[in-house]
Structures are given as C-alpha cells and as structure tokens.
Swiss-Prot record:
Record's GO cellular component terms: cytoplasm
Subunit-level organization: Homodimer.
Keywords of this entry: Cytoplasm, Glycosyltransferase, Purine salvage, Transferase
Organism: Solibacter usitatus (strain Ellin6076)
Subcellular location(s) of the protein: Cytoplasm
Any GO MF annotation of the entry: adenine binding
Lineage: Bacteria, Pseudomonadati, Acidobacteriota, Terriglobia, Bryobacterales
PANTHER family: ADENINE PHOSPHORIBOSYLTRANSFERASE (PTHR32315:SF3)
Gene3D superfamilies: 3.40.50.2020
Role played: Catalyzes a salvage reaction resulting in the formation of AMP, that is energically less costly than de novo synthesis.
Protein name as annotated: Adenine phosphoribosyltransferase
Catalytic activity: AMP + diphosphate = 5-phospho-alpha-D-ribose 1-diphosphate + adenine
GO process terms (BP): adenine salvage; AMP salvage; purine ribonucleoside salvage
N-terminal signal peptide: none
Length: 173
C-alpha cells in the first residue's frame, strides 16, 4: 500500500484561522492512493458479513460505494434534509454550536441488515453516532464504522464506544 499520508495535502487556516485541514483531493487523484484506501478498508472488513455500506454525505459518498462493490454489498446514502425523493427517516443531533439533521430512505435498511458505516473523517463522532442510531432505529445492526482519517485529539472514537471503529490514518494534531 502506498504511503497514504504523503498523498494528503495539509492546508493551514482552512476553513477558518487555527484549523489545519486535511485535503483528500490529492489522495483521490492518485490511482494508487484511492485504490489503497479502498483496499485498506476492504482488507479490514473482508471477514465480516456486510449487507449494506452506508455512506455519509458528502465525502462518505466517495468511498462507500467503491467499498460496497469490493465487499459485494449494497450502498445506502445518508443525506442532509430534503435531498432524497422517497419517504425518509431522520435524526437530529447536537453539534458544538447548534444541531444538524440526517435523512435516509425509510426502506433503506431492513430488520437485521448488517451495516458498515463509512465516512472520510472521524472528528468528534457526532455525525457517525447519529448515523449509527439511525441504522439501529431502523432495525439494522452496525457491524463497524470505517474512516479514512481519524483526528485522535478530538476523541470521536470514545463517542462511538460499543462499536467497532477503524481508521486507516490517524492525526494527533
């Protein structure tokens, strides 16, 4: 596998001063980098039965469908409100300064479906935790939460306690 960290551009003071942004577009444009991410996630989850890979808007949509294909599973998008055409279930969750809402089609996850949740980044864990609650409320079983990058200093993994959490890359600042 290529050195994935070397393919990620670090952008200081984006989107606001004091934030160091990890830009994955440089990793995505490199075929070995993109393949390395999908292969790394696939290798971790290959021995777990996965019915559905759920991708969180927006960058989770980049990785989740490719991983679903690699695992022989289906793909379900979780989106911001009013982006899906059929009847949806929704969850509103707390952010540091307010709330946010996620939706998925009501018929997307069946009772007992084994669901792997995928996103590009684990920060505080709020969005991933909300997605896991949505899956469980729909009768699904969360078999794991997979991320390309984990910002360990934000302790999102602790918020997801009780779930199998895996990240390919960890940053401590």
């Amino acid at each position: 596998m290529p050195d994935l960290k070397s393919l990620i551009r670090e952008v200081p003071d984006f989107p606001k001063p004091g934030i160091l942004f990890y830009d994955i577009t440089t990793l995505l444009k490199d075929p070995s980098g993109f393949h390395g991410v999908i292969d790394g996630l696939k290798d971790h989850y290959r021995d777990i039965k996965v019915d559905t890979v759920l991708g969180i808007e927006a960058r989770g949509f980049i990785f989740a469908p490719a991983l679903a294909y690699a695992l022989g599973a289906g793909f379900v998008p979780v989106r911001k409100p009013k982006k899906l055409p059929a009847e949806c279930v929704r969850i509103t969750y707390d952010l540091e300064y307010g709330t946010d809402t996620l939706e998925m089609h009501k018929d997307a996850i069946g009772n007992g479906h084994r669901v792997l949740i995928v996103d590009d980044l684990l920060a505080t864990g709020g969005t991933a935790s909300a997605a896991a609650r949505m899956v469980q409320d729909a009768g699904g079983i969360v078999v794991g939460l997979g991320f390309v990058i984990e910002l360990t200093f934000l302790a999102g993994r602790q918020r997801l306690n009780g779930h199998d959490v895996f990240s390919l890359l960890q940053y401590d600042k």
